[in-house]
């Protein structure tokens, strides 16, 4: 069901000169991107901000899954998750398959958008990635979701009470 398990990860986004970091929160049941942030540093504060954004918009899941990246093992991040009463699940070190839903998102983001561009500024990367993720949620159907989009699957996977609200 929606909002039961959320997965977080961070990836590098190449630019014309250098790179930025993209962190996202994905609802595992629907593949919907609930929150994201493009930042110029890999710090726990960015992971904290993106999970807080998801909590504010969508409530609190039972489980938050991440890898063992320094931004996710930092107290600044773990305290926020645990204070909400979530169970924090961390993948085995180097075990990318454990977080396959976010890894698959990264493939889509990079091959369907990022690698076709050469962002010349952080603001251009932020705007274009936000545009892509909005499109991804609303229009990118998935064979694993019975050809539904993440938004369609998310709404269908909400508990009945949440749908009525």
Description of each model-found segment:
Residues 1-165:
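Charged DNA-binding/catalytic regions of mobile-element recombinases
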């Amino acid at each position: 069901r929606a909002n039961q398990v959320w997965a977080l990860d961070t990836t590098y986004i190449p630019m014309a000169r250098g790179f930025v970091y993209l962190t996202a929160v994905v609802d595992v049941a629907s593949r919907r991107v609930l929150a994201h942030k493009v930042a110029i540093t890999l710090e726990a504060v960015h992971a904290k901000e993106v999970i807080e954004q998801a909590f504010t918009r969508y409530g609190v899941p039972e489980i938050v899954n991440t890898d063992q990246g320094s931004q996710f093992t930092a107290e600044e991040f773990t305290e926020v998750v645990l204070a909400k009463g979530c169970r924090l699940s961390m993948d085995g070190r180097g075990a990318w398959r454990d977080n396959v839903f976010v890894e698959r998102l990264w493939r889509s983001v990079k091959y369907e958008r990022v690698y076709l561009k050469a962002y010349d500024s952080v603001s251009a990367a932020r705007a274009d990635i936000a545009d892509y993720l909005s499109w991804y949620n609303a229009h990118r159907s998935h064979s694993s979701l019975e050809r539904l989009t993440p938004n369609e699957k998310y709404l269908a996977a909400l508990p009945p009470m949440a749908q009525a609200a």
